Curated annotation (Swiss-Prot):
Family stated for the protein in its record: Belongs to the ATPase alpha/beta chains family.
HAMAP family documented for this protein: ATP_synth_alpha_bact
PROSITE patterns, sorted: ATPASE_ALPHA_BETA
GO molecular function annotation: ADP binding; ATP binding; proton-transporting ATP synthase activity, rotational mechanism
Membrane topology: Peripheral membrane protein
Designated name of the protein: ATP synthase subunit alpha
Lineage top rank: taxon: Bacteria
Function summary: Produces ATP from ADP in the presence of a proton gradient across the membrane. The alpha chain is a regulatory subunit.
Family matches, as CDD domains: ATP-synt_F1_alpha_C, ATP-synt_F1_alpha_N, F1-ATPase_alpha_CD
Organism of origin: Xanthomonas oryzae pv. oryzae (strain KACC10331 / KXO85)
Length: 515
């Protein structure tokens, strides 16, 4: 006999089965890749994408949304794009790019995404921060009044740099720009200033050499190296300065001092130009996009000296009574000394001064090849140590007068005594400003050298023996007046007792004749 089912039983059975089915609904914003070329992906069908948002692609690859158009999104791939295909699924993440930050990064070499590339294992950093951030406002800033010693007599005496300043280092290729910046990093050993060195578009061998030199000089322990080498994509070179800045800001926000070197921003601008042209953005002067000024201004404005209130607010009261600072040394490479090109003029107008390095001076053996006439520090004077400020006033004047007189002396057959003395003093000052690479000088030694040349103690020393005399003088003071040297290095003060000690020590050394 056939079993008959009531319609109500059938209905109950269907309801039970429906209730037993477990469905989970997940809202996703997905699109599909329509083209991939030269590190740029075009994605159709993505809605509600934010400018600068991370877009997830297959194989754990991410892209950065830069062009938001009516029907599609133009994004730049961060990393390898060879495995991407037309039709691949792209998803929004709702996040912007973040990199690891913290003291765990000190002594490490990372790429633009904060991933370690030095073979020393994982970083162990527990915190991350977005690469793009609004610069501190006017209310949160403090004036620059503490020095950053570079260890170079010519810079610390004539073009002083303060904590929180942006000082441009500009010059042609092979004029010693990187050498100056690396020596400044080495000189921060023992000062408590943390350093970040960002290598943009450089040869990997050059970066490896810099890391080795930092390690040899004991400076890698307080330094983070961010490397986006020439072999990496334009996207990595474009974001690397922002990533490095974020790593430096970590220390500034917690009431510490940091120094960041961007080497160099010319290559970042070229990488950004490449990305912009591939995204079909309209080109402007020198084919750069219209927002290339903003590219650098939003980066360099993040370097600042911030107040105690800012640090206290940022740390929720964990750190009180301390100011923080991020000092920036951006480097720009010029072509045949043309500082009126687009990118150099932009960065000159953004920064608080510039150090011009000249090919002619470099080839003449004057290294660092600083042109004191057109180099300037707009805010660093307030940050100079007392002793250097007191003694260095005559240096710039001596050099300026020497250059003027040297030009006239070429046409004069005989010179009066005063002119001849000025020329000889200028020659000695120029010679004394020379300094070897990887040999930054302490405040006391700088002060001693400047005092000796200003007071005429070097007038009877042959020019070709000046540097040997200087080396011997420093060694003499270290042996006979070590306590005074330590006091000057720690306080930077100047008084009559120090002057008397300088006079006596220099005269004693000259009588020994051991130079």
């Amino acid at each position: 006999m056939a079993t008959t089912l009531n319609p109500s039983e059938i209905s109950d059975l269907i309801k039970t089965r429906i209730e037993a089915v477990k469905l989970s609904a997940e809202s996703r914003n997905e699109g599909s890749v329509t083209s991939v070329s030269d590190g740029i992906v075009r994605i159709f069908g993505l809605a509600d994408v934010m400018q600068g948002e991370m877009i997830e692609l297959p194989n754990n690859t991410f892209a950065l949304a830069l062009n938001l158009e009516r029907d599609s999104v133009g994004a730049v791939v961060l990393g390898d794009y060879e495995n991407l295909r037309e039709g691949d699924v792209a998803k929004t993440t709702g996040r912007i790019l973040e990199v690891p930050v913290g003291p765990e990064l000190l002594g490490r070499v990372v790429n633009a995404l904060g991933e370690p590339i030095d073979g020393k294992g994982p970083l162990g950093a527990t915190q991350t921060a977005p690469v793009e951030r609004v610069a501190p406002g006017v209310i949160w800033r403090k004036s620059v009044d503490q020095p950053v010693q570079t260890g170079y007599k010519s810079v610390d005496a004539m073009i002083p740099i303060g904590r929180g300043q942006r000082e441009l280092v500009i010059g042609d290729r092979q004029t010693g720009k990187t050498a100056l910046a690396i020596d400044a990093v080495i000189n921060q050993k023992g000062t408590g200033i943390k350093c970040v060195y960002v290598a943009i578009g450089q040869k990997a061998s050059t970066v490896a050499n810099i890391v080795r030199k930092l390690e040899e000089n004991g400076a890698l322990a307080h330094t983070v190296v961010v490397a986006a080498t020439a072999s990496e994509s334009a996207a990595m070179q474009y974001i690397s300065p922002y990533a490095g800045c974020t790593m430096g800001e970590y220390f500034m926000d917690r009431g510490e001092d940091a120094l960041i070197v961007y080497d160099d921003l010319s290559k970042q601008a070229v990488a950004y130009r490449q990305i912009s042209l591939l995204l079909k953005r309209p080109p402007g002067r020198e084919a750069y996009p219209g927002d290339v000024f903003y590219l650098h201004s939003r980066l360099l404005e993040r370097a600042a000296r911030v107040s105690e209130d800012y640090v206290e607010k940022f740390t929720n009261g964990a750190v009180t009574g301390k100011t923080g600072s991020l000092t920036a040394l951006p480097i720009i490479e010029t072509q045949a000394g043309d500082v009126s090109a687009f990118v150099p003029t932009n960065v000159i107008s953004i920064t608080d001064g510039q150090i011009f390095l000249e090919t002619d001076l470099f080839n003449a053996g004057i290294r660092p090849a600083v042109n004191a006439g057109i180099s300037v520090s707009r805010v660093g004077g307030a940050a100079q140590t007392k002793i250097i400020k007191k003694l260095s006033g005559g240096i710039r004047i001596s050099l300026a007068q020497y250059r003027e007189l040297a030009a006239f002396a070429q046409f004069a057959s005989d010179l009066d005594e005063a002119t001849r003395k000025q020329l000889e003093r200028g020659q000695r000052v120029t010679e004394l400003m020379k300094q070897k690479q990887y040999a930054p000088m302490s405040i006391a030694n700088q002060a001693l050298s400047i005092y000796a040349v200003n007071e005429g103690y070097l007038d009877d020393v042959p020019v070709n023996k000046l540097l040997a005399f200087e080396e011997g003088l420093h060694a003499h003071f270290a042996n006979t007046q070590g306590e005074l040297v330590s006091k000057i290095n720690s306080t930077g003060g100047w008084d009559n007792d120090i002057e008397a000690s300088f006079k006596k020590g220099i005269q004693e050394f000259k009588t020994t004749g051991t130079w």
